[in-house]
Amino acid sequence: MTLDLDRIVAIDVHTHAEVGRTGEDGLLPEWREAAQKYFGEGGTPTVEEVAAYYRERNMLAVVFTVDAETVTGRAAVRNEEILEVAAANPDVLIPFASVDPNRPNAVDEVRRLIRDTAVRGFKFHPNVQAFFPNDRAFYPIYEAIEEAGLPALFHTGHSGIGTGLPGGGGIRLKYSNPMHVDDVAVDFPGLTIVLAHPSFPWQDEAISVALHKQQVYIDLSGWSPKYFPPQLVRYANTQLRDRVLFGSDFPLITPDRWLADFAQADFKDEVRPLILKENAVRLLGLR
């Protein structure tokens, strides 16, 4: 099936398939409950349900899971399931993979996915996966992704997962400072990087990294646009207008809610289509 980009109204670069066909769920129950309480929304969609939801809205969705089995002891939705469903729904789903970087065979698995599947990028969640992105032990992973010409998306900033729990449910926020990803951007200048979310409490750091490193993008997922820090809106309207991306964090924030609030936010008219679609078209090589 040929992708009809003219039909697409927006590209959501940040959505989650939460459960697998046979019940896989990579998050601890208390983490999921805390995140849903924090966001006031939620749900546990399968990959098929993500596809149906976005098809109704004439949107494309980058979809992934978070593999953190060495931390949680729980299997996430299988990458193969996401890839299979995306292949059956190419008009709506763009599959990213998640590989727990702490797995002994992580780089081999990344290379296998690149070699044998239609994976379009990789998602990392340093808080949940408990790693510093700039730990050189993980550099072979980035090298493989860079060689393949695929993007790497990193969670940055605060995490709704664990919020409000004693000890944050064991989640350490230090892992998600975007300055750790700055090292990765320096050492892998050919690697396209997406800093996911407004990176509170390190918003200025994220802006600086993206401004300084030409291959670094920012996605706007996980927050309602009415709460965006003013400096983020200012740079999205000006120097970073070509590297800011629409993302919702579905199902924790729906694109319906995000887009309604985006319509009221202080973005320039000429910048809105860049954020909603055109920047992602370029990032993902859709044209």
How would you describe each model-predicted region?
Residues 60, 68-163, 172:
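Active-site gating/metal-coordination segments in enzymes
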Residues 14, 82, 95, 113, ...:
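Conserved, mostly hydrophobic/aromatic
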Residues 26, 120-121, 134-245:
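Catalytic pocket-lining loop regions of alpha/beta-barrel enzymes
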Residues 1-16, 20-56, 60, 111, ...:
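Mid-to-C-terminal alpha-helical segments outside catalytic/metal-binding sites
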Residues 15-17, 65-66, 97-101, 123-126, ...:
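A cross-domain feature marking catalytic cores of carbohydrate-active enzymes
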Residues 21-27, 75-76, 109, 164-167, ...:
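Short aromatic-enriched loop/helix-cap "lid" or pocket-rim segments at secondary-structure transitions
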Residues 44-50, 77-83, 106-108, 178-181, ...:
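Alpha-helical scaffolding within the catalytic cores
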Residues 17-21, 68-71, 101-105, 158-162, ...:
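Active-site environment of divalent metal-dependent phosphoester hydrolases
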